Regions:
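Feature captures the catalytic ectodomains and active-site-proximal regions of enzymes
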Residues: 1-268
């Protein structure tokens, strides 16, 4: 029918199309951001639920694989030094710059400010609105930077990934164009305030829109190498990995990295 994975609608199987009182559920999601709501719903209805990982301390479920505590994250180290920090994104990527960025911590660290911009809800898929909320994210982020006195700020633009999942190439092109313009605006603000911007990603998507056959849409993340652009003309940037970003930020701030960080400063 020409329906790819991204757009398969829910299916009800014949025979037993619903959960019965004696049924139990096993949740295979390892990420909690989309699983905890459904888990809570099942628990509230009295079902036995086992989850792959711990989704929330508020959910009393057996867990297949216990999580490891992540200590001395970048946000925690900045907080320990009394530095202010800003974390900003629209809804689709808000958890990525807060909960995930902070090693699975829900609460803000002292000195941490969070900025949430609602993602569009007027469309079913973002190829219909590839600009998403990027312009508002950039505007509010810039305004907060200008008055906040932050030592560190992180902002996520969701467009290349979220629109990339649609596989609709013209929409992805528009998404990247909008992101480029908004990113340029943010960099101008950072440089005007005397700061340095580090521009990177944690995975690819929009750069590969077709499968190897040259026809089928590619809608998944890629494992391609990602760029790291540093807007400091006085340094050269070495190849590295995502784990090197936090030590690089700390080096710019003149802070020693904790022993828990095994990465290195990429700017020489």
């Amino acid at each position: 029918r020409g329906v790819t994975d991204e757009f398969i609608e829910p299916v009800v199987l014949r025979g037993r199309p619903r959960l019965e009182p004696e049924d139990a559920a096993i949740f295979f999601n390892f990420r909690p951001d989309r699983a905890r709501q459904l888990t809570k719903l099942l628990l509230d209805d009295g079902y036995d639920v086992t989850t792959m990982t711990r989704y929330s301390d508020e959910l009393d479920t057996p867990v297949a694989f216990a999580e490891q505590d992540v200590d001395e994250t970048l946000a925690e180290v900045l907080s320990e030094h009394g530095l202010r920090q800003l974390h900003a994104a629209e809804t689709e990527k808000y958890a990525h710059v807060t909960y995930f960025f902070n090693g699975g911590r829900e609460e803000e660290w002292p000195g941490e400010t969070r900025l949430l911009v609602p993602s569009p809800r007027e469309v079913g898929t973002y190829d219909k609105q590839p600009e998403m909320s990027a312009e508002e994210v950039a505007a509010r982020f810039d305004a907060e930077l200008a008055v906040g006195g932050y030592a560190f700020a992180v902002v996520n633009f969701a467009n290349p990934d979220m629109v990339g999942h649609s596989g609709v190439i013209p929409a992805v092109v528009k998404a990247v164009e909008v992101t480029d313009a908004c990113l340029g605006r943010v960099v101008e603000t950072v440089e005007r305030l005397g700061g340095v911007a580090l521009i990177t990603a944690d995975h690819g998507n929009a750069e590969q829109m077709l499968e190897e056959d040259g026809e089928s849409p590619h809608t998944a993340h890629t494992t391609n190498r990602v760029p790291l652009v540093v807007t400091d003309p006085a340094v050269s940037v070495e190849d590295g990995e995502l784990g090197d970003l936090a030590p690089t930020v700390l080096a710019y701030l003149g802070l020693r990295k904790p022993l828990q960080m095994t990465g290195r400063n990429l700017c020489k």
